Amino acid sequence: MKKILMWLTVLTLMLTGAAFADQENAPVMLVKLPEDAQMVENVAFDDGDFIQTYQLSGGAYVQLLRYAQGDVTLDGIVAGDWPGATDIQSMALETVGGYAAKGLMLSVEPEDEEAVRVALVLVSADRCALVYQAVYPQRLGDDQIDDAVQRMVDSMDVLGGSAAKDVG
């Protein structure tokens, strides 16, 4: 009985180690943020998910997220995080770092809050979903917002994952 328990413990540790090793090699999205960006949140979860939030000038912020399950969709993000979104427009985006990507720009006027313009980019990388979410107060104007978002989207890349290995 002791040998069985010992082998079960060893097997559990091996599987746990393999899971953590897989997370370390999981892809992450790289984005060149404006110089004034300040990280205000950096949370990693045991399942491989993570959230990084950066505060920008003018009340804007950017979030970089990784979901270990790749079943995340832009429609799901909009429905869950931005109900009542209007003026939803697709971005001209097909790949980021060799992985399939899609993007949306949308407007949201939350009740009792300032209207915002939101940019979302979803990259399907290996078994993960990488998400870029930029939120700008609408008062900054569409031209300034679109320019800032376009510069960040143009700088996007993916570090790690199988597509990066194949490019070599």
What are these regions (language model features)?
Residues M1-I4:
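Positively charged n-region of N-terminal signal peptides that target proteins for export
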Residues L8-T16:
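Bacterial N-terminal signal peptides
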Residues L15-P27:
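Sec-dependent signal peptide cleavage junction
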Residues P27-G76, E109-E114:
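Secretory pathway targeting signatures of secreted, lumenal, and periplasmic proteins
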Residues M29, P34-Q38, V131-G168:
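Surface-exposed amphipathic alpha-helical segments
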Residues L33-D36, L56-G59, G97-Y99, L122-A129:
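Short, solvent-exposed coil/turn segments at beta-strand boundaries
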Residues D36-V40, A85-I88, A101, M156:
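Short glycine-aromatic motifs
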Residues A79-D126:
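Signature of long, low-cysteine stretches enriched in small and polar/charged residues
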